[in-house]
From Swiss-Prot:
InterPro entries: Conotoxin (IPR004214). This is Conotoxin ViKr92. It is found in: Secreted. Residues 23-51 form a propeptide.
Length: 81
């Protein structure tokens, strides 16, 4: 009997916890790990945009170690692809 009540209380607690921690319980329950991953990807993309890039014809340094070329590759100078 005690085990039954303990199981009922545990299920009610976990259900309440799920609804309290969900962002929007009316439509769907979101996976917090996927949400965190998407936010991290957005952060990385915004940091790449802030870094800036070089136009074709500008010196970029050694390939793969130099500066980032806009819409091209780096072979000592930025080359359009």
């Amino acid at each position: 009997m005690k085990l039954t009540w303990m199981m009922i209380v545990a299920v009610l607690f976990l259900t309440a916890w799920t609804f309290v921690t969900a962002d929007d319980t009316r439509y769907k329950l979101e996976n917090p790990f996927l949400k965190a991953r998407n936010e991290l990807q957005k952060l990385e993309a915004s940091q790449l945009n802030e870094r800036g890039c070089l136009d074709p014809g500008y010196f970029c340094g050694t390939p793969f170690l130099g500066a980032y070329c806009c819409g091209g590759i780096c072979l000592i100078v930025c080359i359009e692809t």
